[in-house]
Amino acid sequence: GERTIATGYTRDETPVRTSEGPDIATYAVNEFPLEVSQRSFWQSHKEAPRVLTEAVFNFAEVKSGDHLLDLYGGVGLFTSQFLEHIGESGRIDLVEGSKSATGDAHRNFAEHTNVGIHTGDVEKILPRFSKADVIILDPPREGAGKNVVQSMVLLKPRAIVYVACDPAALARATFNAKL
């Protein structure tokens, strides 16, 4: 038989692990299928995507016609859950630094003309936007950083929902938002 072996990489493309399995796995979150390649990030706990999206949804208060920014958006977990709520007149722009993840996102949202996928550093891409109604961000453990937080505040969104795995990073972001 044929086996697929892939090497996992850090954000700077340093190889850190080798794994065996399909090149692309498909996960359904609330019935929306998401393709995730081996080089892209995905939550390891099987219930985490559903629990996270429900929590974010409860805080975001997204409305039809909203422009939503999904920062550090990966393969599009949050984007997938807000599509039906923004309607055809709304828009979601997903920004992610991983080329593998944005490649997956392009496949996941190929038929959705109101979703933009942007590959690159969030800090550099965020200033290109002139407004956003809602911003969702799920940055890496070190947090979003002062410049990203201040750029978000300048967009004057109705809501910012920050998913943080490190309380200290969230505290820094909150402090920077008040400056």
PLM-predicted stretches and their roles:
Residues 150-154, 158-179:
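C-terminal substrate-binding/active-site "lid" region of AdoMet-derived donor-dependent transferases
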Residues 1-137, 142, 147-150, 156:
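Accessory RNA-recognition modules of RNA-modification enzymes
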